[in-house]
Amino acid sequence: MTDRVDINRVLMEIRSFKAQNQAMNSVQGVGNSLEGVNNTRGTQQVNGPRFGELLEQAVSKVNEVQQASGAMSQAYIQGDSNVGITDVMIASQKAGVAFDAMVQVRNKLVEAYKDVMNMPI
């Protein structure tokens, strides 16, 4: 009976990975829509990375973590002896935390954008 519960738990985690991967693919479009962020007029040029570049790097990093987690779970499913369930679960949790943080950043950006758009001129 214990083996059956463990199999169900693994299947549930696989479904969770799939859902996270699908959600991550929908968030990847955010990076593409940020191209206009760097177009500024009438502002002073400063040295260092631009906001859009930083945000794009963050989205890319979250994507890398998600891809690594998916690859690790796929390797475990295929029976790779070098990948343990604990490694898969840790990678999954890291990917989940990174994705949740990215969603919160996106929510704050949308909220800030709405605040700026609602400001009287």
From Swiss-Prot:
Protein name stated in the entry: Flagellar hook-basal body complex protein FliE
BP GO terms, sorted: bacterial-type flagellum-dependent cell motility
Subcellular location: Bacterial flagellum basal body
Family of the protein in this entry: Belongs to the FliE family.
Organism: Saccharophagus degradans (strain 2-40 / ATCC 43961 / DSM 17024)
Domain of life: Bacteria
Any one GO molecular function term: cytoskeletal motor activity
One term under GO cellular component: bacterial-type flagellum basal body
Cited InterPro entries: FliE
Keywords: Bacterial flagellum
Zinc keyword on record: no
